[in-house]
Amino acid sequence: MIGKHCILELCECNSVKLDDEAFIRTTIQMASKVAGAQLLNLITHKFVPQGVTGLALLAESHISIHTWPESGYAAVDVFTCGDQTMPDKACQLLVEELQSKRHSLKTLRRDTPVMISNALIN
Amino acid sequence: MIGKHCILELCECNSVKLDDEAFIRTTIQMASKVAGAQLLNLITHKFVPQGVTGLALLAESHISIHTWPESGYAAVDVFTCGDQTMPDKACQLLVEELQSKRHSLKTLRRDTPVMISNALIN
């Protein structure tokens, strides 16, 4: 398996935090750390009138967060490669830090087409 | 629906192109354009001894590419929001530009948990 890709939908989050670019940056840094990943670069963008996007380039792939404060919603991806990383821990941290009261987590294995016939493992 | 997330596995690609950071940058810029998306920021990283990661921050979400030249493989995500973008066109361009002879494309809808019970639409 090349990697594990967690697709996380966070609902009923704290809207103030979802719209706080500095908070999103710090939270992505924390998420990288608890996942056991190496953060190589991090870019964020604050949209007008609301919303933040954060993209973390990891040695082991990436974390992305897109927020819709007006809906209390964030779309998160945590994609990590290798056996040493724990993307589930990053997801759990994001649920807690963004104070999501309702979430959905799906995990895909990323691999060559021959290997992904059973791509949805959770 | 918040957005459409294309998960693309590219196999049997041109390994030289997969390892060419400048080529990956240019290709992501082209992919953003054909998708009808607005590219706000683009970061890339060249790994040693091989491999490139590219992350594009779009006004409409993101594009990510992670390459394994030694396997001829690239893991691609094209996540766009709104009705005006065409992530499928970006995927088709990436298949062609990276000269993938075999690929797999899955499309997820991204939305709040209530709405994603039928998340896999393709």
Swiss-Prot record, chains A, B:
Heterotetramer of two alpha and two beta chains arranged as a dimer of alpha/beta heterodimers. Is synthesized initially as an inactive proenzyme. Formation of the active enzyme involves a self-maturation process in which the active site pyruvoyl group is generated from an internal serine residue via an autocatalytic post-translational modification. Two non-identical subunits are generated from the proenzyme in this reaction, and the pyruvate is formed at the N-terminus of the alpha chain, which is derived from the carboxyl end of the proenzyme. It is an enzyme of class 4 (lyase). The keyword Lyase applies. The gene is speH. Binds 1 pyruvoyl group covalently per subunit. It catalyses: S-adenosyl-L-methionine + H(+) = S-adenosyl 3-(methylsulfanyl)propylamine + CO2. Belongs to the prokaryotic AdoMetDC family. Type 1 subfamily. Its cofactor is pyruvate. The active site is at S61, H66, C81. One of its GO terms (biological process) is spermidine biosynthetic process. The modification Pyruvic acid (Ser) is found at S61. Keywords: Autocatalytic cleavage, Decarboxylase, Lyase, Polyamine biosynthesis, Pyruvate, S-adenosyl-L-methionine, Schiff base, Spermidine biosynthesis, Zymogen. Its EC number is 4.1.1.50. It comes from Prochlorococcus marinus (strain MIT 9211). It holds the Pfam family AdoMet_dc. Catalyzes the decarboxylation of S-adenosylmethionine to S-adenosylmethioninamine (dcAdoMet), the propylamine donor required for the synthesis of the polyamines spermine and spermidine from the diamine putrescine. The record marks E60, S61 as: Cleavage (non-hydrolytic). GO terms for molecular function: adenosylmethionine decarboxylase activity. Disulfide bonds: none annotated. HAMAP family: AdoMetDC_1. The keyword Transport does not apply. One of its GO terms (cellular component) is cytosol. Pathway: Amine and polyamine biosynthesis; S-adenosylmethioninamine biosynthesis; S-adenosylmethioninamine from S-adenosyl-L-methionine: step 1/1. This is S-adenosylmethionine decarboxylase proenzyme. It comes from the Bacteria.
